[in-house]
């Protein structure tokens, strides 16, 4: 759309550059997301409980790959949800467990959406997560976490001590930690 307007200076769309998607998305975004996650869940820098934690990464595009790699480097037990069979195979070849969202959500201490698509973490995944699990979005679009649907289903959202963490409580009393109200943390 902007191509139809004359510009007085040259403009480059860096977000479309291969060097952006192949390097910044795959490495920089994964690293910056984990830096943000750690800053939020361990503000005192006493040691976040990532080693050994079961972590689900939804999506194995460039951002998902980076999130999975850095999560594994931090000691997390990473599983990947990927609908594209070729990307799912790539995740397996990279050494990650690949499973359905329902399987991963049932045992995940953290669930990360890395798809840039709405409704990536639906209400049934929130219901399946264990008590105190962390729910976060690597970046992307509004609505990746269906927390509005959760609120309509009787869940409640309250602020925690940290302004970057909200408590999402189910009607049965289970509480999840939602980072940045389900908006992108990158």
Segments and roles (model prediction):
Residues 62-67, 88-89, 118-122:
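Short glycine/serine/threonine-rich phosphate/pyrophosphate-binding segments
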Residues 1-8:
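Phosphate-/polyanion-interacting regions in eukaryotic proteins
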Residues 16-17, 83-84, 117, 140-141:
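Short, ordered loop/turn segments at secondary-structure junctions
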Residues 23, 27, 31, 61, ...:
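Electropositive phosphate-/nucleotide-binding environments in soluble metabolic enzymes
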Residues 10-45, 147-186:
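Adenosine-phosphate binding glycine-rich loop
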Residues 14, 58, 72-94:
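NAD(P)-binding Rossmann-fold cofactor-contacting core
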Residues 92-178, 184:
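Rossmann-like adenosine-cofactor binding region
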Residues 30, 34-37, 42-72, 79:
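Glycine-rich adenosine-cofactor-binding loop
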């Amino acid at each position: 759309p902007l191509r139809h307007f004359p510009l007085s200076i040259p403009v480059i769309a860096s977000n479309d550059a291969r060097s952006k998607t192949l390097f910044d998305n795959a490495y920089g975004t994964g690293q910056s997301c984990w830096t943000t996650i750690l800053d939020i869940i361990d503000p005192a820098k006493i040691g976040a409980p990532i080693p050994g934690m079961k972590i689900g990464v939804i999506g194995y595009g460039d951002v998902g790959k980076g999130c999975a790699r850095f999560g594994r480097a931090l000691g997390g037990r990473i599983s990947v949800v990927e609908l594209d069979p070729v990307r799912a195979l790539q995740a397996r070849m990279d050494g990650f467990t690949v499973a359905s969202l329902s399987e991963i959500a049932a045992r995940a201490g953290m669930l990360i959406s890395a798809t840039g698509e709405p409704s990536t973490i639906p209400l049934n995944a929130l219901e399946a997560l264990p008590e105190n699990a962390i729910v976060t979005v690597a970046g992307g679009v509004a609505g990746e976490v269906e927390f509005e649907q959760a609120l309509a289903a009787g869940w409640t959202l309250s602020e925690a001590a940290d302004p970057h963490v909200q408590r999402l409580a189910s009607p049965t009393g289970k509480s999840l930690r939602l980072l940045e109200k389900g908006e992108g943390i990158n």
